[in-house]
Amino acid sequence: MKSFAKLIFRLLCFLVLAAFVVSCFTQYIPPSKFSYVAIFSLAFPYLFLLMIIIIAVCFFINRRLAILFLVSLLLGYKNLSSTLAFNFSSEWNIQKKDSTLRLMTWNVEDFVNLLEGSEVRLKMLHLISQNNPDILCVQEFTNVEGGKWRVSVRKELDSLGYKYYFFSNDNVNTAANDVRITMRGAAIFSKLPFIDTCRFNIRKDINENAICASILFNNKPFTIYTAHLASFRLYMDTDNANKDIYKITYDRKRAVQYKLRETEQLHEKEVRIIRNFIAKSEYPLIYCGDINTTPCSYNYRFLKNDLQDAFLAKGSGIGTTFYKILPTLRIDVFLADPAFKINQCTVVQRQLSDHYPIVTDISWK
């Protein structure tokens, strides 16, 4: 019986090892070639933790196995260094230096509630005002005009000094009684004037666009891009409103894993379009937004290319930006051209939208 238990333990250990090895190479495997890579990239942090637990246990019962697993951990260096930022001594200074440019990217979830006097929306606007970015990039943004009890967020942001703005216009001019949805999608708000703007389609079936704006900073031009990559839409219905999200996931495990694989394949198409477009950028560039994929994924690596990940450069820890499902989902990014110096970067952990905003200060090198 004892030997049988050892056999089962060894078998489980090697199954974990095999899964871990696959998860170590997810940045190099296109989802179009192997769709299950989407699941392995999500699993990497947890498989890494399991490996450490196995090493700790095997250290007392099987030293050879412990050494094998310890050496195997080295395979995870690339994904680990993309998942964790090791700048643990860095502290965020909310007072921006005059020589730097502050930018914020945030999936605002339609500002949650566009009714006049909405407490959550007012708190979100206060957070923006408090951090005082020069440029604000938002995703899942909706602006309404008209209606007795509705407010225009565009006008509210205008009152905070964001006089320049550009929208992706994914879905506009939708009428509901006297309410008009005039903007929907991604948006760039700026306190600095635009030199030029553009939008380009990344998904024709639902008219989803990426946008960019060229701006002068310290007399030098740069271009900032933002977009919202396809959502997984795992929990769009309300049939299970009284269940927790983990129970829903278990109940729908087959549909969930299929949706993960399918959407990650769609992301591959989207990032190829974005990459091809920004490769032609005339000026140094910044890309920020909700990419709906983790730093262990092929799509993150393809999009990042030679750009700097601001969180890895100046943040600390995991940097979760979507907090509702797993504690390891850093699915919003701020990527900067090597021409920029990343001065500081933080994820503001305020549960207002379903995403946390990223705030970054940069300067020219």
Predicted region positions:
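Acidic/histidine-rich helix-loop elements
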Residues: 105-121, 142-146, 233-263
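Active-site beta-strand/loop signature of hydrolases that rely on acidic residues for catalysis
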Residues: 102-108, 124-149, 189, 213, ...
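Short, Lys/Arg-rich, polar N-terminal cytosolic tail immediately upstream
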Residues: 1-3
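Membrane-embedded segments
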Residues: 85-217
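Beta-strand-turn-beta hairpins that frame and shape the catalytic cleft
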Residues: 94-104, 190-196, 206-249, 340, ...
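Internal/C-terminal transmembrane anchor helices
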Residues: 62-84
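Short, solvent-exposed loop/turn segments at secondary-structure junctions
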Residues: 109-111, 143, 172, 192-195, ...
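Metal-dependent phosphoester-hydrolase catalytic domains
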Residues: 6-20, 25-58, 67-68, 79, ...
